């Protein structure tokens, strides 16, 4: 099975770091990490190499990578809590639980074309970031493997 690696997103992440106006507003990026990124950014060639360049004892590799993707998707420190849940799959015997989704404390997405128009503006803004992440993944995958993948509106939850 084909997979993508961090290096497949190297150019996109490099671009997002170069064009970010204020890295400190990005979730998980502290002023110290922002300064480190800005100081080392002129040397940026490839993402894995850049992670090694800025890694230090107070920064884990995972945190650095996560902060880079948060920059790519413009996830700010003050983002609201996710106001919806998305069903990706379920067991057939559990599908009856979906009839209770009207009573849920947050919106449960099963059919995007039907559910997204019902979202409030905050949820739609956050969902747009989900779509961007999915679309970028799909685009990078298609470019690397010369295959197409369905977009988020073209597939339903998997029933096992």
What do these predicted ranges mean?
Residues 1-160:
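Non-catalytic terminal extensions that flank enzyme cores
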């Amino acid at each position: 099975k084909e997979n993508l690696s961090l290096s497949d997103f190297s150019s996109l992440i490099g671009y997002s770091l170069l064009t970010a106006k204020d890295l400190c507003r990005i979730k998980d990026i502290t002023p110290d990490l922002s300064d480190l990124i800005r100081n080392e950014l002129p040397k940026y060639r490839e993402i894995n190499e850049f992670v090694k360049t800025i890694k230090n004892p107070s920064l884990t590799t995972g945190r650095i990578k996560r902060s880079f993707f948060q920059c790519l998707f413009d996830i700010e420190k003050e983002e609201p809590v996710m106001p919806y849940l998305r069903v990706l799959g379920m067991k057939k015997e559990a599908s009856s639980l979906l009839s209770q989704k009207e009573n849920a404390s947050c919106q449960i997405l099963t059919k995007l074309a039907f559910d997204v128009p019902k979202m409030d503006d905050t949820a739609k803004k956050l969902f747009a970031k989900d779509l961007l992440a999915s679309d970028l993944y799909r685009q990078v995958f298609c470019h690397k493997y010369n295959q197409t993948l369905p977009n988020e509106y073209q597939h339903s939850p998997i029933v096992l």
